[in-house]
Design a protein with these regions (language model features):
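Conserved redox-active cysteine motifs that mediate thiol-disulfide chemistry
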Residues: 1-3
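Short, conserved sequence motifs used for protein processing/export or organelle targeting and
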Residues: 9-122
């Protein structure tokens, strides 16, 4: 997985949740239980690992399959842009703000935007 994510750095951003199975003492799970439980319930995760791309679950987890799916989704333009602003005034502080800009009139009525701040090496 890391190989293909390196190839798509700056275009594809992984969000990895650590669940309470098979090991309920996983330190990442213990630190972030409410959010992980919320995501497991939202996506209906029955087992791990599991991959969701733009929401729906994606089952064909091969390098070529992921590459094709990434390329397919990257070819679809987004109706919104997210501009982020980062300030690091001190070594122990990071301030982040976001602007969400709609480039098109949104379709649908039950729309939700979920933003995540992640730590990743890209």
């Amino acid at each position: 997985m890391d190989v293909i994510l390196e190839e798509y750095a700056g275009q594809v951003v992984p969000i990895r949740y650590h669940v309470w199975w098979p090991n309920g003492s996983d330190c990442f799970w213990l630190f972030n239980q409410p959010e992980v439980t919320d995501r497991v319930d939202y996506y209906g995760v029955p087992a791990v690992p599991q991959i969701h791309i733009d929401g729906p679950e994606y089952n064909l987890v091969t390098y070529d399959g992921l590459r094709a799916k990434f390329d397919e989704r990257l070819a679809v333009s987004s109706p919104i842009r997210i501009a982020n602003f980062v300030q690091m005034p001190y070594l122990d502080s990071v301030y982040v703000s976001f602007d969400v800009i709609a480039d098109e009139e949104p379709s649908g009525t039950d729309l939700r935007l979920r933003l995540a701040v992640t730590e990743w090496r890209h």
